């Protein structure tokens, strides 16, 4: 289990990267225009919409020098501005993750893997 950790005057706090990814994914799903996280099948190159339980597979968390970098692989709604959706996602996730973890979010990369028409 990879973990992001920080030292405090009372001891060490370790937060699993999986927990950070889950929190970031939940925050992302609250953003307008995000349909879900994308999982890529390396074998055949197909992109699939991940279920809520496995959405962390569409998010990669990296910690370097006490700063977080996140890679999101997302599917967006048809007809929305991808730039507006990405800006909203970055702002929301950065703010909420910094409040949640106490770590600085240095960079959020967004990879739009698909578009889905919502009924």
Model regions: which residues?
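Conserved amphipathic alpha-helical interaction elements at protein-protein interfaces in regulatory
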Residues: 78, 95, 99-100
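Contiguous, often N-terminal, cationic amphipathic patches that form binding interfaces
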Residues: 1-76, 82, 87, 103-109, ...
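A short beta-strand micro-motif common to beta-rich folds, especially ectodomain repeats
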Residues: 89-93
